[in-house]
């Protein structure tokens, strides 16, 4: 992937989300799916293709081709929105070994996902296409006293 492509996708995320452009772009790191299963999904099978876990890195699965696939580029835009959310909270400048300066609440995590999926859908629509991204979020809610969203 080219830095120009990532800069353009970050620009889409800024434009569609309303967040200000960050002083520094994220570092896009390409990873195999096993990384996402282990790190993002707590070693459980999952369909995660992109992940932002705080800091400066945005992780994208190695099978995605954002240069030639609208769906793949929309995933990068989605993760760029999460980076912008992190920058807005100050999570792009972290102490070593921590993902977030302050762990987001369950409700905040769900709100961020809704926001990122809304931007992803709008990005896809601007290209004249419809892909039903984010529908799994309809069944996600917070259990009382839980820090993590649950899907039912």
Question: Language model features by range: what are they?
Answer:
Residues 20-27, 91-95, 127-138:
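Surface-exposed patches in mature extracellular/periplasmic domains of secreted proteins
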Residues 66-74, 86-121:
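Post-HEXXH active-site segment of zinc metalloproteases
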Residues 80-85:
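Short active-site segment of divalent metal-dependent hydrolases/proteases
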Residues 59-62:
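Non-catalytic terminal regions of proteins
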Residues 46-55, 112-116, 124-125, 149-152:
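Extracellular/mature segments of secreted proteins
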Residues 1-55, 65-69:
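Auxiliary, metal-adjacent structural segments of Zn-dependent hydrolase domains
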Residues 109, 125-152:
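Long, well-structured alpha-helical subdomains associated
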Residues 40-47, 105-107, 141-143, 151:
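Sequence contexts marking disulfide-bonded cysteines in secreted/extracellular proteins
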């Amino acid at each position: 992937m080219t830095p120009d492509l990532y800069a353009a996708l970050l620009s889409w995320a800024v434009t569609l989300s309303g967040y200000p452009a960050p002083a520094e772009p994220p570092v896009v790191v390409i990873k195999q799916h096993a990384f996402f299963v282990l790190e993002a999904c707590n070693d459980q099978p999952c369909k995660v293709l992109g992940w932002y876990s705080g800091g400066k890195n945005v992780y994208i699965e190695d099978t995605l081709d954002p240069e030639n696939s609208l769906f793949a580029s929309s995933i990068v835009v989605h993760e760029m929105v999460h980076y912008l959310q992190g920058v807005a909270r100050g999570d792009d400048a972290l102490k070593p070994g921590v993902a977030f300066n302050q762990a987001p609440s369950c409700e905040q995590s769900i709100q961020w996902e809704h926001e990122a999926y809304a931007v992803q859908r709008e990005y896809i629509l601007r290209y004249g296409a419809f892909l039903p991204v984010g529908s799994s979020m309809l069944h996600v809610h917070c259990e009382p006293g839980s820090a993590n969203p649950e899907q039912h």
